[in-house]
């Protein structure tokens, strides 16, 4: 009798394990219904007046749900897009600030250029690149007379670069300081630099300096300056993470900041360029979805309001993920927003 009981318990345990295994390997299921006054749903088409909240009711057992409303900036098909057509952009503007420190002689120390004709640096032929940047017919990005002309000041700049949309725009900054043996040399701090694209659909994207492909061209790399002795490798094109005189520091470029310092007196002349890749100024941020459920939540509905008349494709991505199975499904609804 005891053996029979053990056998029954064994069968029950095996059945429970099998049931759990089946549950872990089931595909995700999700249904969506809209049932409310003032909103109609026919098949996969929802019709609603602008400004009326839509309540999406869920059935099934998804662990996670991601929602793309279909409005500008939240289109599922654009979730990996990083460029738009030039005609889709209303304006493109380069913003930045320049602050100064130290030094006394600022005349002709800093130059800023732009071009859509620059062929690009080789980045492995320093002789060719150093001649190219010096002899190229650059266009002034900011006139010399408008750049900071003394220490301890900050100026803000806004430059319209809309005309470069769809063209490979290269930015170049040239620092050249002469050691007069009496004064330290200027330091220029660039901050809050970004290219702002305003699209015709109202979405704004920011393109930061860390995305520009900036490369330094260190014109004094073969002069064995004591102030640059700490730069042991890539002296031709390298940047530094400290205050090495005459060498660009791009550590904070992802936040819009970088700088170059000339160093103290009697440390030798400084000469360095900072040149971007050919920038595709039609950059945009990928569209983003909204997480409306994760595995820790029990969500039965979600409310979203469409305020502008038009037709949108709302996309819901449902997933179930565990150590045995990974299941995903997509549900799309056409949202017709009327007056």
Model-identified regions with their sequence ranges:
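Exposed low-complexity, polar/acidic, P/S/T/G-rich flexible segments that act as propeptides
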Residues: 180-229
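Bacterial Sec-dependent N-terminal signal peptides
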Residues: 1-5, 12-42, 327, 339
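Residue-level recognition of secondary-structure-to-loop junctions
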Residues: 300-308
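Extracellular carbohydrate recognition and processing domains
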Residues: 130-164
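Short, solvent-exposed loop/turn segments at the edges of extracellular beta-sandwich modules
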Residues: 178-181, 319-325
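Extracellular beta-strand-rich recognition modules
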Residues: 92-100, 110, 167-177, 313-315
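C-terminal edge beta-strand
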Residues: 191-193, 325-337
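Residue-level signature of extracellular beta-strand-rich folds
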Residues: 48-50, 56-60, 67-69, 302, ...
């Amino acid at each position: 009798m005891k053996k029979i009981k053990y056998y029954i318990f064994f069968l029950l345990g095996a059945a429970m394990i099998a049931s759990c295994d089946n549950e872990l390997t089931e595909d995700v299921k999700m249904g969506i219904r809209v049932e409310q006054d003032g909103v109609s749903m026919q098949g996969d088409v929802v019709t609603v007046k602008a400004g009326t909240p839509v309540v999406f009711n869920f059935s099934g057992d998804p662990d996670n749900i991601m929602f793309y409303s279909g409005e500008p900036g939240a289109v599922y098909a654009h979730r990996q897009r990083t460029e738009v057509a030039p005609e889709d952009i209303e304006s493109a503007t380069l913003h930045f600030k320049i602050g100064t420190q130290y030094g006394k002689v600022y005349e002709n120390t800093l130059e800023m250029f732009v071009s859509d004709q620059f062929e690009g640096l080789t980045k492995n032929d320093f002789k060719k690149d150093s001649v190219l940047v010096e002899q190229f017919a650059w266009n002034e990005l900011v006139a010399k007379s408008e750049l900071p002309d003394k220490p301890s000041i900050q100026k803000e700049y806004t430059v319209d670069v809309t005309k470069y949309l769809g063209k490979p725009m290269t930015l170049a900054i040239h620092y050249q300081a002469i050691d007069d043996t009496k004064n330290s040399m200027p330091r220029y701090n660039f901050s809050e630099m970004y290219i702002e694209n305003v699209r015709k659909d109202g979405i704004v994207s920011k393109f930061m300096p860390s995305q520009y492909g900036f490369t330094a061209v260190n014109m004094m790399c073969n002069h064995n300056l004591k102030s640059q002795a700490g730069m042991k490798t890539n002296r031709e094109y390298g940047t530094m993470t400290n205050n090495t005189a005459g060498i660009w520091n791009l550590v904070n470029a992802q936040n819009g900041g970088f700088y170059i310092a000339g160093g103290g007196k009697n440390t030798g002349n400084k000469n360095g360029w900072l040149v971007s890749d050919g920038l595709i100024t039609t950059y945009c941020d990928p569209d983003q979805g909204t997480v409306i459920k994760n595995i820790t939540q029990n969500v039965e509905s979600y409310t979203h309001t469409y305020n502008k008349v038009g037709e949108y494709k709302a996309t819901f991505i449902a997933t179930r993920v565990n150590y045995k199975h990974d299941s995903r499904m997509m549900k799309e609804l056409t949202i017709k927003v009327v007056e």
